[in-house]
Amino acid sequence: MWPFRRKTPDLPPIPNTRTEYPYGLFVCTEAGFFLIREKGRYRIPTIRVMASWSAPSVQSSEDAVKHLPILGKIGFRDGSIIQDFSNQKTYLVSRNKKRHITSPDVFDRFGLNKELITVVSHEEANLHEDGEVLS
């Protein structure tokens, strides 16, 4: 045994009975990630979508949240820059809509970092409706 090894803290137990989570909390269950809202929860369909929110999540169980209906899916966070892998189109997510970027000058005009582009599947890009074109 190493004399300088730190003890890892014990994790709190995962709730398995009905739990009233507060609004806006991200919860991870065996069925995936969810965002808690007033009348239910929204499914976060992929890890890439979850990563765009840069939010911590708490561990839970389906038994703890089964009283909350699944109201739909949630897409990428506003301000995310995504690129559809199937057609190479780049979008800025704004007001929950994907705005097609048709000119590289848009990045300079708004101070956007091209290194923050997240390559996504066509299905992930279609979580958002089309918005106005940015050119």
Language model features: what each stretch is:
Residues 2-135:
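Short, surface-exposed polybasic-aromatic patches that bind anionic ligands, especially phosphate groups
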